[in-house]
């Protein structure tokens, strides 16, 4: 009986570490959250990049929290969505604000971005930061 219990514990423990193609390790269970751990942002934002927790937005302009100033800034619009993420074993799940769900195998993740058409890169000449208002886009 003890051998069976130890075997089950071993199986559960081994399923708690999964690797992503970003060479980041995420493991264990993550209860539903709007704010995933900082060390997991690279993982979560690689596969659904429109989640609000992936962006620092100020005055209508958003910069990536993962890639920072080395990435293109975007205009804050319908592309940036409130998302909750969770992980149970090897199942990673995104819950997007319109009650849209995306689930994937954590160790075999697939990018998902149905909002890509709404993404608008920020260009200084087109949208000066000081004049940009949310109702302009």
UniProtKB/Swiss-Prot annotation:
Quick one: signal sequence residues?
Answer: 1-20
Glycosylation sites (chain numbering): 69-70, 105
KW Lipid biosynthesis (keyword) present:
no
Keyword Signal listed? The answer is yes
Q: Known Pfam families for this protein?
A: v110
What keywords were assigned to this record?
Answer: Glycoprotein, Signal
User: What role is this protein assigned?
Assistant: Plays a role in virus cell tropism, and may be required for efficient virus replication in macrophages.
Q: What does the sequence similarity comment in the record state about its family?
A: Belongs to the asfivirus MGF 110 family.
Question: What name goes with this protein?
Answer: Protein MGF 110-7L
Organism for this UniProt entry:
African swine fever virus (isolate Warthog/Namibia/Wart80/1980) (ASFV)
